[in-house]
Amino acid sequence: MVKKYSRKEHILLIGFSTIIFLSMLLFFLRIHPLIIYDADDWLYASYFRLPIPIWHDWNPSRVFPEIFMPLCSTLAVYLFMPLTHDYIWSLALMYGIVVSSFITLYVYAFALFLREKMKASVSNSIIISTFFFLFHFLVFKTSESGNHHMFYANDVTCYFYYIIPTILNVVLVIILELYPDLMDIFSRKNGILKGVIS
């Protein structure tokens, strides 16, 4: 079970998460902007479908990305386009916020895992998580195709189809490690309910 945190520890974790979020937002807005440009991006930014598997579609199991990407695109049009008057930049802003949020959640979950399971102090878990975060950018420094990073994808669609679901899965595994009682609750459900939940 997760321990209680002191006020100072909460402030440290919130400050750390804010720095990660702002650095990733700056990265995805200025250094590596998430601009829609290819046919997949244009198609899936506005491809609305039912939130259930479509059996005769080419990939019936792709539900989350095909719901989440157009939802983010629609929110961008209603929230940011009235302010920016630029469709492409509105989408890039929303995509940057969404991807930065998921990466922040990922690094935050890793810091909590270090604190709870590895018994690290909050300051040590923040230091280790900072290196963990930075190594995502350093690991491909000598790549022949440029300075790619572990959060790299060829287009915006790949972020929603691969990067975000992978991050979400890692965070869910960490949550199940931190709260093992959740697995007990899940294992007591019947098969149909398990399928609906997962």
Predicted regions and their residues:
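Start-transfer (signal-anchor) and selected internal transmembrane alpha helices
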Residues: M1-M24, S123-I128, I192
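Transmembrane signal-anchor helices characteristic of membrane glycosylation enzymes that use polyprenol
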Residues: K8-L43, F133-F140
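Extracytoplasmic loop-helix module adjacent to an early transmembrane segment
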Residues: S23-L71, V77-L83
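Juxtamembrane "helix-exit" motif on the non-cytosolic side of transmembrane helices
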Residues: L29-I31, L79-T84, A111-R115, L138-Y152
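Juxtamembrane segments of multi-pass membrane glycosylation machinery
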Residues: L75-V99, V107-F110, R115
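Transmembrane-helix motifs of polytopic, lipid-linked glycan transferases
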Residues: I97-T130, V171
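Membrane-interface micro-motifs in multi-pass membrane enzymes
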Residues: N124-E177
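Short hydrophobic alpha-helices at membrane interfaces in multi-pass membrane enzymes
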Residues: L178-S198
